Amino acid sequence: TICDFSTPDSWVILSPIEQSIKRKIEAVGTPLKDWDINIYRGVLTGCNEAFIINSEKRDEILANCQTDDERNRTAELIRPILRGRDIKRYIYDWADVWLINTHNGIKGRLERIHIEDYPAVKAHLDQFWDKIKDRADQGDTPYNLRNCAYLEDFCKPKIVYPNMTKYMPFTYDEGAYLTNQKCFIITGELVAYLTAFLNSSLFKYCFRDSFPELQGGTRELSKIFFDKIPVLKVSSAIEQRFIEAVDDIQQSYTSQKAKAIDTMFFDLYNLTANECRIIGFIGIE
């Protein structure tokens, strides 16, 4: 057994073959901090019980709108939201919850939401006035969410993952969902391919211990740890193969499809049959 003391961050005990596999990955990979990607935290409301609602409450708010114009505006304002617990390997289990996205705007690009334009939403939030008026996470008014300069990134293709997790699942979203503060998102280049890599057994085998383990086996997936992960950048032709594979597995998840994507990475990194056998398939279900 070999002790790898090469980084000041952690000491990891590696067998010779484990060290061989990890060196292969690191030799050809580019640290994620040098990729054209952004990693952001989900939306903070300061009062989830007021701003995060189920479909029944959403329908009630829409029914209380006085005009079709108000109803249409309100329907656009209330967005589906994913929470950390909803994220699975490649897929997500949306829990029928919505965010009242009374955002605070983006300076020079997007005007903040004016609650006077949404009377039915205001009536709902007024029920929580004592809780929302003094909360720390608020915008220009208690009705507004705090500033979020990257709000538009939620509408882009993105990776979504929980900030605390035992199983390290990652899913891919084309832009339909916002996320709560228990999630992070990654936007930028090669995000479908990167989703596949982060879900792969290869990633978990090599880099699971790069993320600190907390009580109960939970790991903290903070940006500072992702920055150091080296990942091979690929051509658009190879990227397309992974885009198609991710799309297919999201249509109907099976462990066989996940194993097939694992094999794609084994081939991409030119791992030997013995190295592939050592890694195996790391299930997270």
Predicted regions and their residues:
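Non-catalytic DNA-recognition/assembly elements of restriction-modification systems
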Residues: 7, 21, 28-36, 120, ...
